[in-house]
């Protein structure tokens, strides 16, 4: 059929526009929706049976109280940490750098005598961006009813052998794969006494100016049943802080508040990425982002990282059974109390580990989040213009802009914009949406979104 003059004119304009665009700006879109074979394989390799064996081995040390026996090979926290280190060295066949990170706590809150606090730290070095780190932890210490009781049976199967076992399983599986960024797998000590082990490591990281791009802790991820008998083995809670509770707010946080971006903190951005990735690779499993730092009256090893200014999250089961936390093992009024391994659902724990592993792999394969993202606020308009600094990755494909309604917790729309450093989203007002900018590599791996700060030209 012959073309009309209008059709011919439109086609010619499109052709001329494409030719006029520099090669770097022309959009050759990577497939961002396709599941990555490497991540799928990692998720499939996570074993509930191995997690169960790790939980039971940790329970076998009788107690892992921070001030418990350290010389025995079979009882106490010393035997537990030596076994964790040896197992990580064995399963990784030299691919992990496994070290003890230790210091002596002279005494203080919940520490009655000078005590060596020892974290087990296994690092999988990145191949192209080793200075960007993602950290995942569980705490291997345990407690009885009395937090100072260092001798009674304190199995700590769910709190937190479950998290420690999940981290060990992730480390052993992921050590057989290579990533752009580095991943640190940690079994930390003295959580029950006051987050001592994690605090020590996080402070060291800040003093060394380490680029910790994200941190997860897994604490109490072993049970799918509440004390009231409710069963939920299809979801996990992911606690993500918004505005930090500090006396002096940094300028970046003030800008978040000023622009209504309380839910666009670095931790909330990380949580969105974890939810999207985890649910993609573990079908039928839901990651529920909880807009809080942690539960009431509780705390976890992500908090020291938050206090050092890092993005950090906490995974915890949806329905806790408090009969099986911080309890001496006993039967009372016909009810079995105590944190015993028979109350751990390791199939559920394995799914939480799979969500962790998928998210970690996705993050460590992806480019870094774009830096210095700014939104033009110099005039009244119904379009939204943004600009950002260039990423340096050799395999960078370009950038993606995402947006959501101000009432939504997750991204709802997106557009690939190519390898450019500025873009205008037509017809979407910055007054009505929250925006983010992500970096995308040629394999379709996507970074965490960066929130645009207002800029007046």
Predicted segment positions?
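A non-catalytic alpha/beta surface segment that caps or lines the substrate-entry region
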Residues: 28, 50-125
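Alpha-helical metal-binding/catalytic segments enriched in His/Glu/Asp
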Residues: 122, 136, 141-142, 146-195, ...
């Amino acid at each position: 059929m012959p073309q009309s003059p209008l059709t011919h004119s439109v086609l010619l304009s499109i052709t001329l526009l494409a030719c006029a665009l520099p090669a770097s700006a022309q959009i050759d879109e990577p497939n961002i929706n396709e599941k990555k074979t490497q991540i799928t394989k990692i998720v499939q390799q996570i074993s509930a049976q191995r997690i169960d064996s790790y939980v039971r081995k940790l329970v076998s040390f009788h107690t892992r109280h921070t001030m418990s026996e350290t010389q025995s090979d079979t009882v106490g926290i010393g035997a537990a940490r030596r076994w964790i280190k040896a197992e990580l060295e064995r399963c990784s066949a030299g691919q992990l750098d496994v070290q003890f990170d230790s210091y002596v706590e002279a005494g203080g809150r919940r520490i009655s005598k000078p005590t060596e606090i020892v974290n087990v730290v296994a690092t999988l070095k990145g191949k192209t961006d080793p200075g960007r780190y993602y950290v995942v932890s569980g705490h291997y210490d345990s407690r009885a009813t009395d937090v100072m009781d260092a001798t009674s049976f304190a199995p700590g199967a769910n709190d937190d052998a479950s998290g420690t076992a999940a981290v060990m399983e992730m480390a052993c599986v992921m050590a057989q794969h290579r990533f752009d960024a580095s991943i640190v797998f940690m079994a930390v000590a003295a959580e029950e006494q006051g987050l001592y082990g994690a605090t020590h490591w996080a402070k060291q990281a800040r003093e060394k100016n380490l680029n910790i791009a994200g941190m997860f802790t897994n604490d109490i991820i072993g049970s799918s049943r509440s004390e009231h008998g409710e069963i939920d083995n299809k979801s996990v809670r992911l606690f993500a802080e918004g505005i930090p509770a500090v006396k002096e707010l940094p300028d970046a946080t003030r800008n978040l508040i000023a622009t209504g971006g309380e839910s666009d903190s670095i931790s909330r951005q990380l949580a969105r990425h974890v939810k999207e990735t985890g649910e993609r690779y573990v079908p039928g499993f839901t990651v529920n982002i909880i807009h809080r730092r942690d539960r009431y009256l509780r705390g976890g090893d992500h908090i020291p990282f938050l206090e050092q200014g890092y993005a950090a999250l906490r995974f915890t089961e949806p329905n806790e059974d408090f009969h099986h936390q911080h309890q001496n093992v006993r039967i009372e009024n016909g009810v079995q109390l105590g944190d015993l391994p028979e109350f751990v659902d390791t199939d559920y724990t394995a799914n939480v580990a799979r969500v962790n592993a998928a998210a970690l792999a996705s993050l460590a394969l992806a480019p870094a989040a774009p830096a210095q993202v700014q939104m033009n606020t110099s005039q009244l308009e119904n379009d939204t213009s943004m600009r950002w600094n260039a990423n340096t990755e050799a395999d960078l494909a370009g950038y993606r802009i995402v947006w959501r309604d101000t009432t939504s917790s997750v991204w709802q729309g997106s557009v690939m914009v190519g390898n450019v450093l500025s873009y205008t989203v037509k017809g979407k007002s910055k007054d009505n949406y929250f925006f983010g900018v992500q970096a995308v590599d040629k394999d379709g791996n996507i970074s965490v979104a960066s929130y645009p700060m207002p800029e007046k030209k």
